[in-house]
Amino acid sequence: MDPNCSCTTGVSCACTGSCTCKECKCTSCKKSCCSCCPVGCAKCAHGCVCKGTLENCSCCA
């Protein structure tokens, strides 16, 4: 398991294609971990908090 990922399911944290970890901290995460973040937001992989589906998350405001 990747030490940077809090996800308990799966052998490793493979965030490159589909990040399903709500608290994914993978540096290799190339997809936003929450739906309100743009795909290019790297900070979304580090403790992103969504306020709503149509709003920006706290790290991408």
Curated annotation (Swiss-Prot):
Residues 1-29 are annotated as: Beta. InterPro entries: Metalthion_dom_sf (IPR017854), Metalthion_dom_sf_vert (IPR023587), Metalthion_vert (IPR000006), Metalthion_vert_metal_BS (IPR018064). A divalent metal cation 2 binds at C7, C13, C15, C26. A divalent metal cation 7 binds at C50, C57, C59, C60. A divalent metal cation 1 binds at C5, C7, C21, C24. Residues 30-61 are annotated as: Alpha. GO terms for cellular component: cytoplasm; nucleus. The keyword Amino-acid biosynthesis does not apply. A divalent metal cation 4 binds at C33, C34, C44, C48. A divalent metal cation 5 binds at C34, C36, C37, C50. A divalent metal cation 3 binds at C15, C19, C24, C29. Keywords: Cadmium, Copper, Metal-binding, Metal-thiolate cluster, Zinc. GO terms for molecular function: metal ion binding; zinc ion binding. Disulfide bonds: none annotated. Metallothioneins have a high content of cysteine residues that bind various heavy metals; these proteins are transcriptionally regulated by both heavy metals and glucocorticoids. Monomer. Belongs to the metallothionein superfamily. Type 1 family. Class I metallothioneins contain 2 metal-binding domains: four divalent ions are chelated within cluster A of the alpha domain and are coordinated via cysteinyl thiolate bridges to 11 cysteine ligands. Cluster B, the corresponding region within the beta domain, can ligate three divalent ions to 9 cysteines. This is Metallothionein-1M. It comes from Homo sapiens (Human). The gene is MT1M.
